[in-house]
Amino acid sequence: MEIGVTQTIQKRLKNQDIHQPYEQTTELAFCWDTHLVKLGRRNVLLIANVSNRFMIAMMDIEPRNWKYYTLYIDEVISNAMKQIGYQEKEIKKYFELAGNIQITKSHGRKTLGAINYITQI
């Protein structure tokens, strides 16, 4: 699974290796882009699936918890899938097919455009 990060998040993930996206080899259903925005006084992490723009919002990540970024993303995606009706075995299969989490640069303009659109609503 690839988790694309914007420059805003790259600054918070100080010691993490950030790779180029592997668009040729990774199915886009297993790619997510993330961006941190300020809505009101709150930091909101927006997580969008690259293939279908399915969007998840996560609020108020404590500064000390950014070192657990990939664990949070994994858990949030799993919980969102449960909320929309996927069974536990289907979620487990999705994560098996997705493989290990790789932090990459974001996957392009379309997903980031969707994220920016959400922040303007």
Regions found by a protein language model. Give the residues of each.
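Globin-like tetrapyrrole-binding proteins
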Residues: 1-22, 85-121
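Short, basic/aromatic recognition patches
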Residues: 13-39
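A short, conserved beta-strand element enriched in hydrophobic/aromatic residues
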Residues: 31-68
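Short alpha-helical interface elements
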Residues: 46, 59, 78, 98, ...
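A short, polar/charged loop-to-alpha-helix boundary motif
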Residues: 63-79
